[in-house]
Amino acid sequence: MTSSSLSTSGISTRTTGSTLLACVGRGLLAGSAPTDNAGNAFVQLGVAHTYTLWPNSGTALYACERAQGRVGHAVTVPKPKDTDETTLSIVEIANGGSVRDVQWREVLSGNPLTSASVTTTGPALLVAWWWGDAGVDLDKTAVPDNDFTVIDSVLASGALVQCAAATRQVSAAGTYNVTWTSTPPQGAQLWLVAVQAA
């Protein structure tokens, strides 16, 4: 899509108390944080990371704790140029609390696509992103293990930044990771976040 920004379609979010996570993949990596139409401020978690195979492209993760919500809530990210391949993934954690741990890892093709581990001190929602590094040909698949459930994905062939997002609710303190299986064979950038009630 040719546009100076990319926005989610209007969604209904809780009026108060949610944690919003925004994971962004760009064909031309840029450091601009998301904005929204509810007046929230998104803070970057860690740093942006480029792909080994695509050194101009990369991903970044942002969060807003205790977010204000609304009907028709739209989150927007600026694009470094109008024709940039940009993918935006938004996850709302109702009554989310605080980001307890966040980890990133890049795994190249031929190795298990296992994320770095996050540690919680109690019950938490885990949110994982898979950003594959395959080229434009063929539709993709990305399937997580360890009881994670895919909640959204962009896996079609074509000039886009492919992504899958998955979640898992854990009931106790512990250390957790996730391994993805994908087709065609490829590497990926892997994010894993633990959001824990305050």
Q: Which ranges hold each PLM region?
A:
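Function-critical acidic carboxylates
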Residues: M1-G122, W130-A198
